[in-house]
């Protein structure tokens, strides 16, 4: 069985993606249904959703939305790599909430859009 570990879904009617305005070629919806049709055709059996750098206020909604899709009959969604902002003051509480959710398999902080000081600082070492 093939496992796709890096699926991005975009639903602009449900979540905000500020960065899409600067990338016209990607500024459209990418649905699970379209993905599933193609993935099954080539033998993908399971998939992990990789966060899509939604607006910070939508981070938990993105995880919940993908988890909801995973409950559909025949869904290949096995988990989510959730977005995170370790530099935010409420990160510890966010992390505890997400760690309680078995659907969350890991975390990613998009770094190419923030100053290097963030990834080189203590917050990423601690």
Please place each PLM-identified region on the residue numbering.
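An N-terminally biased module of ancient metal coordination in phosphate/nucleic-acid-related enzymes
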Residues: 1-67
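Active-site gating/metal-coordination segments in enzymes
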Residues: 60-126
């Amino acid at each position: 069985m093939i496992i796709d570990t890096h699926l991005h879904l975009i639903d602009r009617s449900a979540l905000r993606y500020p960065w899409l305005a600067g990338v016209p070629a990607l500024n459209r919806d990418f649905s699970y249904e379209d993905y599933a049709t193609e993935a099954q055709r080539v033998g993908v059996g399971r998939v992990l959703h990789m966060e899509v750098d939604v607006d910070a206020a939508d981070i938990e909604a993105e995880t919940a939305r993908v988890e909801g899709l995973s409950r559909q009959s025949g869904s290949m969604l096995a988990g989510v790599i959730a977005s995170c902002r370790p530099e935010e003051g409420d990160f510890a509480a966010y992390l505890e909430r997400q760690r309680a959710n078995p659907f969350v398999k890991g975390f990613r902080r998009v770094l190419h859009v923030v100053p290097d000081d963030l990834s080189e600082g203590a917050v990423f070492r601690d």
